[in-house]
Amino acid sequence: MPCTTVLAGKLATNDRSTMIARTDDGHFDEKKLIVVEPDQQPKIYKSVESHVEITLPENPMRYTSCPSVDPKHGIWAATGINAANVGMTATETTTSNPRVLAADPMVELREAKDGEEERCGGIGEEDIVVLVLPYIRSAREGVLRLGALLEQYGTYESNGIAFSDENEVWWLETVGGHHWIAKKIPEDRVIINPNQFGMDSFDLEDAFGARESHLCSADLREFISENHLDLNQDGKFNPRDIFGSHRDMDHIYNTPRAWFMGRCLAPHTYRWDGENADFTPESDDIPWSYVPERKVAAEDIQYLLSSHYQGTPYDPYAGHAEKGGIYRPIGINRTGVTTICQIRSDVPDAIKGIEWVCFGSTTFSAWLPVYTNVPQMPDYLSNVTLDAETDNLYWVSRFVGALADKCYGSCIQNVWGYQDTVNIRGRQIVLKYDRLMRESGDFTLAAQANDELCAMAKEESTQILNKVLRTASEQMKNGFSFADTCVNK
């Protein structure tokens, strides 16, 4: 998927939680948030896209999932948190280069033709969450399981995948059809990744030694050497230069997003604007990781992932005729779902996992926190139809975005108020139920909390829909200033 990812280590956040977040920017895919119980997990998985068939381990865990409502192209689970409080988001579609893809080709489906049997493809975004998340008890285990699957079955696309637990965040990027490289995020860092191979440093000695913070395919050194992939002149190992891309397209689609996020996280650490800027929107060497100048909260990640270059000449809503809209924004119209998987360290195990869910274009939608260790999600999040309606948060968010976009200046203050109110009321409900569950020891109250959260979200989303619909109606092009009473006088 053409997505944007933000990862935060526990010392970079305001509450020592880990957070992994990603916009799932498909083709206006209808999405929902559900809980998958162990008896609902398949024993043999078959991909719709690649036809690969994989026998799954016994004893899967419960996990949350954001699958496509229409199953005709597969599950596309996107993201979730399992019962062991391990989070995962998959995938960030990334880039590669011809040298890598020639040396280790993608494993693509080859249909039966001219008497030849069908050859299955590898695994991809459609499959990865279902294949990995129910079976892992730490972020590191997620990397190792996915790495083994990539080596055995291969993949047909370049992807980045994030894993998190209470203490660690890991980022894995695929390299060609079967290779991979993964890094533990330093605890005090925030990572940004916009549809490009992002990792810009890697310790090969650690990966082939202690394996404390770096993991990779067993033959990665030989793969690089035998295929002359290392283009670096300074002796440093930079995976982005070796495995990634520096295309003209990156400079309008990918690097500008990194530039905007970097200037938010480290506005004074680097110079982002002017003739003497360290980095411009089209720089290929924008840093991948940052020690943020102040600790980040969930709302800061929300801001990054809903941005449209506000405060810059590239904002499509600001009326800059020359530059507005020339770069791909992060908050984009086709987003299906965005989540922040937050694993907290200051609450009991049963309620460590919080998933912040946002449907539709993040610029206009609200983020709702929900507890993940529950038997099912409320209908307002899980009962999403293919036909537009107003009984679920997905479609209401779509309506609000489509209406407010056309009259941005008139609607955006109401939208900001809606987003802030849902954040405030959502946090209040979580704080209340955290306290109740700690005091009572009854962690089944998490389901009741989610019901209350969704009732609040429905109330607030109905109000904002009423407001933007009224504003958009008043600004229709067929409006006329005379009323019937004026004509008849």
What does each of the following model-derived ranges do?
Residues 2-125, 145-278, 285:
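A contiguous strand-loop segment
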Residues 129-135:
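Short, well-ordered beta-strand elements within core beta-sheets of diverse protein domains
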Residues 135-141:
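Short, charged, surface-exposed loops that flank catalytic or proteolytic processing sites
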Residues 142-151, 301-305, 447:
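Short, well-structured alpha-helical segments that form the helix of a local strand-helix-strand
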Residues 254-324, 328-333, 418-423, 427-434:
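Accessory, solvent-exposed terminal regions and/or long lumenal/extracellular loops of proteins
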Residues 421-489:
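Histidine-centered catalytic/metal-binding microenvironments
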